[in-house]
Swiss-Prot record:
Keyword line: ATP-binding, Glutamine amidotransferase, GMP biosynthesis, Ligase, Nucleotide-binding, Purine biosynthesis
GO cellular component, one term: cytosol
Lineage, top ranks: Bacteria, Bacillati, Bacillota, Bacillota incertae sedis, Caldicellulosiruptorales
GO MF annotation list: ATP binding; GMP synthase activity
Name of protein: GMP synthase [glutamine-hydrolyzing]
PROSITE patterns in UniProt: GATASE_TYPE_1, GMPS_ATP_PPASE
Length: 511
């Protein structure tokens, strides 16, 4: 089935993935493409609408990202956001200027609710601004649709041309009625029907996998996390016993995790699960390595080598399944965006892979979408709602060199923290919570004796999709109990700190 599609052209803004997520929440499928995608390719896809994202550039910069001007003549509705809004005005004959001061944060805005873009909205509300340049004069044939105290043209458009621009960011939660604005664009202006659903995604992926794989054997990288679990069950549903799940126990897992994975997938789902004990191999490869990017690359490479070796025992295996999801791709660098950190499912892969093809059935989904797919597939709630755990495991939660002793310390600390959070019923409120073993030692006093031991950091955040996150406000008495148990029961730890940094500026993981 061919779904209606909206194309999001990426100009390098920080909220671009949120735009895609908001569109999908409306039941409309969308894809993010680089801003310099050839117009012919866009036309070939027959999109219902096009969205220009924000970005850090100015339209007057020498190498500013631009589009083919003919895009405004193909009859497809366009919505420009922030930089995209300025680009539309600039290309169509308007004037863009630079403000004396940057406008950033929540701003009162007044809408022309007669416009199809703002139908159903109150005449005034709050929006989120983040810009220096602004549209000073409109292109011919366009009208002002919204304004703020400092931005006379906060939105403009042409009902006839179906081209609209907004200087603010409707995709962020700080903009009141932002989702309604996006819905209005999709349904009132683009004429979308909203035919993209989780159930149809599953059916299409199953058919696609069967078509690609046929009767051949497939190896799946199974870790027991949400992503790899959903990927494994989805592929198993498509090809059954031709799927061989390889579970690599690299010694970097949390307490009791390896045993739980085998019990669930081999026992409950009756899958072919091959367990590989590779603890010594990974520790040897990580010996002396301190740089987090090197850790990720080494772990990714060792993973693939183990898969190759195990797959060779199965005969001719051409396909490898991985649980890569959209934020993995985003943070590893998409289009012109900068790389934040390498993910073992993306940038951590070695250049030479002996498998003919990597199958990533969840590559286009955000985490919340992956969870919904998992529920549809009948995966137990305890797995579907499991908090994210990075592929490199505890290796990137140990700052500095990874050793067996440090792993044992971190496992115990992490287990104590997770146990207490679950006992208090906070596990469903918090997106992710874990411990980090820092490379910092500090002086302490225990039993009238001086100690000089490790400092551990506790990290807990609230989020929806992992793209942005805020630190969780865990009650002090809970943190106190966790801290007391850690320093009293875990050897070589004498200090516990709590990380209160949001994302951005920090990432959720420390490495």
């Amino acid at each position: 089935m061919q779904h209606e599609i909206v194309i999001v052209l990426d100009f390098g803004g920080q909220y671009n993935q949120l735009i895609a997520r908001r569109v999908r929440e409306c039941g409309v499928y969308c894809e993010i493409w680089p801003y310099d995608t050839p117009l012919e390719k866009i036309i070939e896809k027959n999109p219902k609408g096009i969205i220009f994202t924000g970005g850090p550039s100015s339209v007057y910069e020498e190498n500013a990202p631009v589009v083919d001007k003919k895009i405004f003549e193909i009859g497809v509705p366009i919505l420009g956001i922030c930089y995209g809004n300025q680009l539309i005005a600039y290309f169509l004959g308007g004037k863009v200027s630079t403000a004396l001061f940057r406008e950033y944060g929540k701003t009162h805005i007044k809408y022309n609710t007669n416009s199809p873009l703002f139908t159903g909205l109150p005449e005034s509300s709050i929006c989120w601004m983040s810009h220096t340049d602004f549209v000073e004069e409109l292109p011919e044939g366009f009208e002002i649709l919204a304004s703020t105290e400092n931005c006379a043209i906060a939105a403009f458009g042409s009902r006839e041309k179906k081209i609209y621009g907004v200087q603010f960011h409707p995709e962020v939660v700080h903009t009141e009625f932002g989702q309604e604005i996006i819905k209005n664009f999709l349904f009132n202006i683009c004429g979308c029907k909203g035919d993209w659903k989780t159930s149809s995604f599953i059916e299409e992926r199953i058919n696609e996998i069967r078509k690609i794989v046929g009767n051949q054997k497939v190896v799946c990288a199974l870790s027991g996390g949400v992503d790899s679990s959903v990927a494994a069950v989805l592929v198993h549903k498509a090809i059954g016993k031709n799927l061989f799940c390889i579970f690599v126990d690299h010694g970097l897992l949390r307490k009791g995790e390896a045993e739980e994975v085998i019990k669930t997938f081999k026992g409950q789902f009756d899958m072919n699960v091959i367990k590989v004990d590779a603890k010594e191999r990974f520790l040897k490869a990580l010996c002396g390595v301190i740089d987090p990017e090197r850790k990720r690359k080494i772990i990714g490479e060792e993973f693939i080598r183990v898969f190759e070796e195990e797959a060779s025992k199965l005969g001719d295996v051409k396909f490898l399944v991985q649980g890569t999801i959209y934020p993995d791709v985003v943070e590893s660098g998409v289009g012109k965006a900068a790389t934040i950190k390498s993910h073992h499912n993306v940038g951590g892969l070695p250049e030479h892979i002996k498998f003919e093809r990597i199958i990533e059935p969840l590559r286009e989904l955000f985490k919340d979408e992956v969870r919904r797919v998992g529920v549809e597939l009948g995966i137990p709630e305890k797995i579907v709602k499991r908090q994210p755990f990075p592929g490199p495991g505890l290796a990137i939660r140990i700052i500095g060199e990874v050793t067996e002793e440090k792993l044992e310390i971190l496992r115990e600390v992490d287990w104590i923290f997770r146990k207490e959070i679950e006992a208090c019923g906070l596990d469903e409120e918090i997106w992710q919570y874990f411990a980090v073993l820092t490379d910092m030692r500090s002086v302490g006093v225990m039993g009238d004796e001086r100690t000089y031991d490790y400092t551990v950091a506790l990290r807990a955040v609230t989020s929806v999709d992992g793209m942005t996150a805020d630190w969780a406000r865990i009650p002090y008495d809970v943190l106190e109990r966790v801290s007391n148990e850690i320093v009293n029961t875990v050897r070589k730890v004498n200090r516990v700190v709590y990380d209160i940094t949001s994302k951005p500026p920090a990432t959720i993981e420390w490495e």
